[in-house]
Structure formats: structure tokens, C-alpha cells
């Protein structure tokens, strides 16, 4: 299909949010011409997308489905540069993310203090996009006939129940629905953005774009195309200039597409502010320094960068336990078995993400008493009067989430943590008017001292969970904090007996130890009165007591390992132009997502969030997409039932061995 030069609506960015907007608007009126422009490749029937169990491949630094941005070095990360990825494929993060179904707390949206954006007002839109594929006691807060599917997947690793039992012993109760918008302390079996009918990832491109393009002729798609800038004339956005996704030699190849009615920028938290800045919207002095003529003065563009700070901690598990380690590390038999099962039935290890259970937690009064004064003050000002806000998240991954070439052989589980509401803030700005140039970027990871105590606290909590799990078999010491050798908190390696099982009878150096820094767990048990062994579970009856030196070791570990959770937001904050408490350096958008000072231009993606949300952010991206579609449609004069904008169902019929098409 030839691409015209003029459209009614242009959506810049085919990510999680942009696909919702373009798909919905194309279904409001068949005469409304909509163009969706995406920098990455088309994801249609791409097995790296629709097979849930191979998602770690998209996280590798050589991935073609993500762009990796390097930050300035940071003293808060022990001199490291942070690496912040952004999806680079149609569907955005929904095509490559962890597929973890979590939702924001009700107070999160209310705290944005934007007209039309309270949780009560957004809940119908949250229900609109989802089909909740499990028994439900909270039917008033979930949806059951939307295009995006939510389920447990079609496989569950045994670490699920093991983890939940261990959490109960720590006073973290099992909760049937931790995503009810109000519960902030509990453990649950983790739901996933997976269609249980087919064992396939549920992403916004297949749900909103491919389904619509099969049935409509008014939706146009361009992939492998980068948005350079929005052209503004007499205070109105009138066109979009594009370039190829990668430079072609020294030539300057560009195209310009006119928009008769509306332009929506939805390029993501990193790219959307850069598009605005290249368009002349931002801090004038910085725009001039980058070679851009200022048009609209909005200093808040690129400011208020936020993320969730995560870290992964591996633990050894017993050799008779199940994990995905063999599959992801290249075992041909394990891979063939998993692929054969999925293509035959849509079930098995490839029909899950391996993240089977997790917690949202708040500290007790006794735990808060151990926090430093800085965090205690932060707690009082931000959390204390909002009981629906969790402080930390952690979950169990049924294998080692990382590079297996750097790890001793064996089976593992990983505790995956992230801080729900960091106080730290960062920024980014274009370094030139070249659309291919990397930004000047400081994400601000861990630059607020109030963020350290909860990160250390969660490490201790999850470590106690791991030690109480039946499958627990030790701690790979090289991947844990480096405590003093005589510390009771020191990491304990797997037992000599488990080492023999991993190594096999022909291994000549198993259990050959140099020095005393790494102690096998069996030897430690002989001197540990708190350890009890039963036929059912290994139980450590008392929590580890940490010294100040131990805490310092954990803090240093956090500085060396804290990283993005792929959840960045805030760089085009929805706030008054002069700013407010959420965006003190100035807002970028009004409550209808219009860019201050420009007509016909909206921004709609996670960059609009003025404050953080306590969840994996895909659910928020979907909510923003649904809201933006309604706002655009209303601005175009549609109302009532026209705003339903129902998209056609994306049909899946057969499992095909080709791995190319499953309809």
C-alpha cells in the first residue's frame, strides 16, 4: 500500500501506547486517515516476540529490538555508566518486556493532580483493554473482553508455591489479587500478559494494529522510520519530518508528512523529549547550544526523568529442582523439547516468563525504626498517609537471569527487586540537531540518599525468603555482597554433596576450595544453631543479624548492581507550565496532553507521568493510550458511543511449525 503525503492524524512512535492510540482512532471513523510511524521493525508474527519464554534474548546488548542509551558516569553507581534501553520494534515494550501483570495503586494516578486523570475516571479505560483470563473475585476492577489478555500463562515452575510458602513464614500473606489498586503488602502468583488460549504474548501491535489493518484501509504503517522533528508553523504543529531508522552513508534522506488535524508524539520517555527539542521546544539556551532554533520555551522538556531501580540476586537451587537454566544456556535437548511442546500445544516452559510469584511490601514499624533519618522523613512525607503504596517489589525467577557464561554450572533461581517510588531524579537533552546523535543523559540513579535504605532492606527480606525455600541450595558468592569472612551474614555456597551432583563423577576439581572466603553451606550448618533440617523444607528459624559493616557491603553491592527496570517515565510531565510539586522545573503538557504553547500537538506515552507508579509500567502505558485516544477523538468532534472505538479481534487459529504465521 502506497503511503500518502497527508493524513488527518499522525502518531509518532509505534510503542505500547502509540499502537493503542492509532488502532483506536482508525476504528472511530473509516474516513479518518491515520499514520503510525515506528523506528523499529515490524513485529508481525515474529517468534522472538510471540514466544513468551525467549524474552531474555531481547535484553542482550546486541539485540536489534532495543536501543541502549549510555549515561554519564555516576559517583552514585561507583563510577559506572547506567545503560537505559528503550524498545525498538513495533509494539514497543509490549513486544519484548517481562510480561509481568502489575497495576498502579489508586493514589498514584490521584497524585498526578490532573483533571480527568483520577483512578475513578481511568478505571473504565483499564477495564476496556484487558481480558482477565482467570477466576476473579474483583470483577469491578478488571475487564473481560478487551484485546489484551492476562493469564498465568500455560506453565508454572514449582518455585511458585515454594516462594509463597516461604513468604508466609515472614509475615507476608498470600493475596488472591495484589493488583486490585489498593493492596500494598502481600504475595501472589504472578499474572502475565500472555494469552492462555495460545500460550502467546499479548502485545499492542497485534491487538490494535495488525487486527485493524486486516479490516480497515484507513490505517497506514511505516516501520524502520525515525521521527526527526515536528514542523511548527504559526504556533501549530502541521507536519512530521522523518528519516530512515539508520543513516544511509553521508546523504540526508528525509520525508515530510502533513497532518490536517492532530499530531501525537509517542516515541517513549527517552525519544519523545528529544523529538520535541529538535522541534524547537524546550530550554532555549540548551536548544541553541545544540544548533536548534527555539520556538516554544518549555524548560521541563527532558527533566524529571524517573525509573524503578532494580537488581538481580541469584541463588543456587537443588539439582532435582526445575529451572530454565538449561534452555537459556543453549542445551539443545532442552530447547528442542520446549519448542516441540509449545508448537504442539501452546504450553510448556515457552508459555511462561518463568516469573511465577512475587510480593509488594511495606515495612513494619519495627523495620522503619532501623531506617536512617533521611528515609524516615521521606516515608512520613510520601508513604505514611498513602497505605496503598508499596515500598518495594521482589519476585522469584525460575533460573539465573543473566549471562550464563559468567556463572558456575548448576541450577539457579533469581530474586528480582525494584524500588517502586525512587526519590532520585534525572534528565536528558539532545547534544545536537542530528536525529541519530545520542543525548546528553543523566538518569540520576540513586542520587537521592533516601533510596538506599529500602534497597538494602529488600535485599535482606528476599534473602530470608530464598533461605526458607525448599529448593534453596546456597549462594554463588561472587554474585553476592562481599562481607567479611568471619561475618555471620557471609554468603554460603552450595554443599559439597550438591557440588558433586552438579559436577558429575568425572569432574576432577569439584569441592577444591582455595582459602576460606567461600564456605560450603553444609560446613556452616555444623556451627549454625539457627538451621533446622526436616524432610520437607530447609528452615532458618531466625533472620540473619547484620552489622554496620555488613550493611555497608550491601550498600556497595547496590551501587555496583542497581540498574534500570525498563520503567522510565516523566520527561514530558503533565503539569502546569510553571511547574508544581511533581514537576518543579516546569510542566510540558496540560491535562488533555496538549504541549503547552503549541496547537495540534500532543504527547502520549510514559513520559507524560509527572510522578511514579508502583507497578510494571506496561499497564500504565496502556491506560495512557486509551485515555489519549479518547482525548484526540473528542477534540475531533466524536462523542458518545463513537468513543468506544472497538478494535477487531486478532484471530489466532492454528499452531504452525514454521514459526512464521499462526492464524
Swiss-Prot record:
Enzyme Commission designation: 1.1.3.13
Motif stretch (Microbody targeting signal): 661-663
GO molecular function: alcohol oxidase activity; flavin adenine dinucleotide binding
UniProt keywords, alphabetically: FAD, Flavoprotein, Methanol utilization, Oxidoreductase, Peroxisome
Catalytic activity: a primary alcohol + O2 = an aldehyde + H2O2
Task performed by this protein: Catalyzes the oxidation of methanol to formaldehyde and hydrogen peroxide, the first step in the methanol utilization pathway of methylotrophic yeasts.
PANTHER family: GLUCOSE-METHANOL-CHOLINE GMC OXIDOREDUCTASE, GLUCOSE-METHANOL-CHOLINE OXIDOREDUCTASE N-TERMINAL DOMAIN-CONTAINING PROTEIN
Entry domain remark: The C-terminal peroxisomal targeting signal (PTS) is essential for the efficient targeting and import of AOX into peroxisomes via the PTS1 pathway.
The name this protein goes by in its record: Alcohol oxidase
Taxonomic lineage: Eukaryota, Fungi, Dikarya, Ascomycota, Saccharomycotina
Gene: AOD1
Amino acid at each position: 500500500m502506497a503511503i500518502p503525503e497527508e493524513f488527518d492524524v499522525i502518531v509518532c512512535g509505534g510503542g505500547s501506547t502509540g499502537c493503542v492510540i492509532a488502532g483506536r482512532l482508525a476504528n472511530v471513523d473509516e474516513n479518518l486517515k491515520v499514520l503510525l510511524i515506528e523506528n523499529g521493525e515490524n513485529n508481525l508474527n515474529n517468534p522472538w516476540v510471540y514466544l513468551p519464554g525467549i524474552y531474555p534474548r531481547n535484553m542482550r546488548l546486541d539485540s536489534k529490538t532495543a536501543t541502549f542509551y549510555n549515561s554519564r558516569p555516576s559517583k552514585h553507581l561507583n563510577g559506572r555508566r547506567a545503560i537505559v534501553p528503550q524498545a525498538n520494534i513495533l509494539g514497543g515494550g509490549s513486544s519484548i518486556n517481562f510480561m509481568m501483570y502489575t497495576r498502579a495503586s489508586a493514589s498514584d494516578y490521584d497524585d498526578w493532580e490532573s483533571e480527568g486523570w483520577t483512578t475513578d475516571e481511568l478505571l473504565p479505560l483499564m477495564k476496556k483493554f484487558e481480558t482477565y483470563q482467570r477466576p476473579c473475585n474483583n470483577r469491578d476492577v478488571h475487564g473481560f473482553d478487551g484485546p489484551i489478555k492476562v493469564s498465568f500463562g500455560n506453565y508454572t515452575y514449582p518455585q511458585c508455591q515454594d516462594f509463597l510458602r516461604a513468604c508466609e513464614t515472614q509475615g507476608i500473606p498470600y493475596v488472591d489479587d495484589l493488583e486490585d489498586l489498593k493492596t500494598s503488602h502481600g504475595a501472589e502468583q504472578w499474572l502475565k500478559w500472555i494469552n492462555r488460549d495460545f500460550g502467546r504474548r499479548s502485545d499492542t501491535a497485534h491487538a490494535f494494529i495488525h487486527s485493524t489493518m486486516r479490516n480497515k484501509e484507513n490505517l497506514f504503517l511505516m516501520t524502520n522510520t525515525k521521527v526527526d522533528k515536528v514542523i511548527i508553523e504559526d504556533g501549530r504543529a502541521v507536519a512530521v519530518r522523518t528519516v530512515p531508522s539508520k543513516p544511509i552513508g553521508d546523504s540526508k534522506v528525509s520525508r515530510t508528512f502533513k497532518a490536517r488535524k492532530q499530531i501525537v508524539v509517542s516515541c517513549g520517555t527517552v525519544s519523545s523529549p528529544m523529538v520535541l527539542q529538535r522541534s524547537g521546544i524546550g530550554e532555549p539556551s540548551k536548544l541553541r547550544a545544540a544548533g536548534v532554533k527555539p520556538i516554544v520555551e518549555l524548560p521541563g522538556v527532558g527533566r524529571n526523568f524517573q525509573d524503578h531501580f532494580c537488581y538481580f540476586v541469584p541463588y543456587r537451587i537443588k539439582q532435582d529442582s526445575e529451572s530454565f537454566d538449561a534452555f537459556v544456556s543453549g542445551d539443545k535437548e532442552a530447547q528442542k523439547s520446549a519448542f516441540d511442546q509449545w508448537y504442539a500445544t501452546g504450553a510448556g516452559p515457552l508459555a511462561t516468563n518463568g516469573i511465577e510469584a512475587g510480593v509488594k511490601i511495606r515495612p513494619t514499624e519495627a523495620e522503619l525504626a532501623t531506617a536512617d533519618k533521611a528515609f524516615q522523613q521521606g516515608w512520613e512525607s510520601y508513604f505514611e498517609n498513602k497505605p496503598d503504596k508499596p515500598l518495594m517489589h521482589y519476585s522469584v525467577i525460575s533460573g539465573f537471569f543473566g549471562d550464563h557464561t559468567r556463572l558456575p554450572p548448576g541450577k539457579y533461581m533469581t530474586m528480582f527487586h525494584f524500588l517502586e517510588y525512587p526519590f532520585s531524579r534525572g534528565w536528558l537533552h539532545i547534544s545536537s540537531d542530528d536525529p541519530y546523535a545520542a543525548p546528553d543523559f543523566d538518569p540520576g540513579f540513586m542520587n537521592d540518599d533516601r533510596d538506599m535504605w529500602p534497597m538494602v532492606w529488600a535485599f535482606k527480606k528476599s534473602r530470608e525468603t530464598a533461605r526458607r525455600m525448599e529448593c534453596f541450595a546456597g549462594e554463588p558468592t561472587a554474585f553476592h555482597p562481599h562481607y567479611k569472612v568471619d561475618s555471620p551474614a557471609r554468603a554460603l555456597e552450595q554443599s559439597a554433596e550438591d557440588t558433586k551432583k552438579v559436577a558429575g563423577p568425572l569432574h576432577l576439581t569439584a569441592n577444591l576450595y582455595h582459602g576460606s572466603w567461600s564456605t560450603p553451606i553444609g560446613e556452616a550448618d555444623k556451627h549454625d544453631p539457627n538451621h533446622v533440617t526436616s524432610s520437607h523444607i530447609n528452615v532458618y528459624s531466625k533472620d540473619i543479624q547484620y552489622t554496620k559493616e555488613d550493611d555497608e557491603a550491601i550498600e556497595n553491592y547496590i551501587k555496583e548492581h542497581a540498574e534500570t527496570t525498563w520503567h522510565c517515565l516523566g520527561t514530558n510531565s503533565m503539569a502546569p507550565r510553571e511547574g508544581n510539586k511533581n514537576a518543579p522545573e516546569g510542566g510540558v503538557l496540560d491535562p488533555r496532553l496538549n504541549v503547552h504553547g503549541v496547537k495540534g500537538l500532543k504527547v502520549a506515552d510514559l513520559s507524560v507521568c509527572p510522578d511514579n507508579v508502583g507497578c510494571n509500567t506496561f499497564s500504565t502505558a496502556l491506560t495512557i493510550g486509551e485515555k489519549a485516544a479518547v482525548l484526540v477523538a473528542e477534540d475531533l468532534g466524536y462523542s458518545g458511543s463513537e468513543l468506544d472505538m472497538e478494535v477487531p479481534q486478532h484471530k489466532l487459529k492454528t499452531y504452525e511449525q514454521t514459526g512464521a504465521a499462526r492464524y
